[in-house]
């Protein structure tokens, strides 16, 4: 029996464009970053039994992204044994931060290494778990397109580092619900053939981009609009935007001190919001 402790970082979509829909899946383009907010997973390999335990949330223990990973990878390994995972959830659930996908990817990386499963196989299996899982396998700044499987890593992209994250308390938002109700008058045009090369061009793209799911999310959580309005008023806020399918929003800053001012003020004045700062990895 072997025990491992792994961390699963939260994801932020700096922008998210929807290009169309094929075979019931939306095609997208998104710039993703990962931040220093982590779920902590204790993974026991060759445990007395397989299973998943969430220490502080009522998440289905028998049908979740981690159980799916354990099952899928066991089918691709001759050395598979019982795996038990205990999860401390720090990433907000149903909030657009890819917590479930991050957990799945963390377990996938570990088991892939221990069971000697090739990275290409892991990437193919990741998409079966969820559209964010391939990106979470990397957990680095990247540009994703298609269903999320077409990934371009951007190791040299230097972005503003400090993020204030704000979510309305008690208002989870289902990704499936948002996508199922997404009915645009027109889809976004692709940018993948004209990706920026220079640093300044990437920053300009980020500033001028958007989250195409915002209007749909607002139908279910109108408070998102107020959060964005408040964030945009703060000094030196570069952008304020919703991440993923919501309802979490973020504001981007160059300086930690500016982000800390926002967090202090909102934690004092908005007890109805969850507010914390983070840093891009």
Swiss-Prot record:
EC number: 2.7.1.148
Organism phylogeny: Bacteria, Pseudomonadati, Pseudomonadota, Alphaproteobacteria, Rickettsiales
Pathway stated in the Swiss-Prot or TrEMBL entry: Isoprenoid biosynthesis; isopentenyl diphosphate biosynthesis via DXP pathway; isopentenyl diphosphate from 1-deoxy-D-xylulose 5-phosphate: step 3/6
GO molecular function, one term: 4-(cytidine 5'-diphospho)-2-C-methyl-D-erythritol kinase activity
Biological process per Gene Ontology, one example term: terpenoid biosynthetic process
Catalysed transformations (reactions): 4-CDP-2-C-methyl-D-erythritol + ATP = 4-CDP-2-C-methyl-D-erythritol 2-phosphate + ADP + H(+)
Family label: Belongs to the GHMP kinase family. IspE subfamily.
Catalytic machinery residues: 11, 132
Naturally occurring in which organism (per UniProt): Ehrlichia ruminantium (strain Gardel)
Pfam families per record: GHMP_kinases_C, GHMP_kinases_N
PANTHER family: 4-DIPHOSPHOCYTIDYL-2-C-METHYL-D-ERYTHRITOL KINASE, CHLOROPLASTIC
Name by which UniProt lists this protein: 4-diphosphocytidyl-2-C-methyl-D-erythritol kinase
Record carries keyword Calcium: no
Keywords in alphabetical order: ATP-binding, Isoprene biosynthesis, Kinase, Nucleotide-binding, Transferase
């Amino acid at each position: 029996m072997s025990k491992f402790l792994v961390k699963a970082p939260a994801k932020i979509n700096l922008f998210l464009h929807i290009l169309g829909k094929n075979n019931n899946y939306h095609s997208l383009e998104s710039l993703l970053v990962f931040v220093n907010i982590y779920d902590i997973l204790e993974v026991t390999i060759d445990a007395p039994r397989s299973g998943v335990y969430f220490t502080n949330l009522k998440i289905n223990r028998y049908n979740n992204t981690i159980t799916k990973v354990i099952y899928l990878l066991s089918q691709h390994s001759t050395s598979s044994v019982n795996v038990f995972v205990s999860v401390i959830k720090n990433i907000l659930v149903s909030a657009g931060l890819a917590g479930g996908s991050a957990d799945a990817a963390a377990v996938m990386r570990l088991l892939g290494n221990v069971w000697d499963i090739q990275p290409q196989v892991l990437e193919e299996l990741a998409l079966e778990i969820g559209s964010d899982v391939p990106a979470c396998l990397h957990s680095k700044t990247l540009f994703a397109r298609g269903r999320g499987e077409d990934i371009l890593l951007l190791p040299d992209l230097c972005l503003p580092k400090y993020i204030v994250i704000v979510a309305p308390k008690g208002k989870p938002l289902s990704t499936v619900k948002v996508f199922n109700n997404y009915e645009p008058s027109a889809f976004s045009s692709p940018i993948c053939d004209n990706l920026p090369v220079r640093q300044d061009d990437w920053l300009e793209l980020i500033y001028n981009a958007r989250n195409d799911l915002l209007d749909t999310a607002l139908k279910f959580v109108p408070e998102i609009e107020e959060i964005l309005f408040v964030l945009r008023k703060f000094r030196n806020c570069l952008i304020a935007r919703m991440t993923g399918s919501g309802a979490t929003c973020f504001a981007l800053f160059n300086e930690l001190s500016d982000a800390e001012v926002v967090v202090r003020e909102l934690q004092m004045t908005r007890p109805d919001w969850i507010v914390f700062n983070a840093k891009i990895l």
